Amino acid sequence: MVDETKLNLIEIVLRAYDPUYSCAAHMIVEDAEGNVVFEIVNDE
């Protein structure tokens, strides 16, 4: 299960890699069963 703490850590890593998320225009994280647990969509 992905809780808010894990989501915050993912966001921190993404911001460290690219503060504008420009390289993560559409990112999906799936669990072992293939269920989407986290998705970023950048419409810019």
UniProtKB/Swiss-Prot annotation:
InterPro entries with a match to the protein in the record: F420-Hydrogenase_large-U, NiFe-Hase_large
Membrane-spanning segments: none
Keyword DNA-binding among UniProt keywords: no
EC numbers on record: 1.12.99.-
Keywords associated with the record: Metal-binding, Nickel, Oxidoreductase, Selenocysteine
Single GO MF annotation: metal ion binding
Keyword Metal-binding: yes
Removed propeptide positions: 27-44
The protein's required cofactors: Ni(2+)
Binding residues annotated for Ni(2+), in chain numbering: U20, C23
Superkingdom to which the source organism belongs: Archaea
Miscellaneous: The large subunit of Vhu is split into VhuA and VhuU. Each contributes two ligands to the [NiFeSe] center. The peptide is so short that about 65% of the chains are released from the ribosome before the initiator Met can be removed.
NCBIfam families cross-referenced by the UniProt entry: VhuU
Family: Belongs to the [NiFe]/[NiFeSe] hydrogenase large subunit family.
Quaternary context: The F420-non-reducing hydrogenase vhu is composed of four subunits; VhuA, VhuD, VhuG and VhuU.
Protein name per UniProt: F420-non-reducing hydrogenase vhu subunit U
Organism: Methanococcus voltae
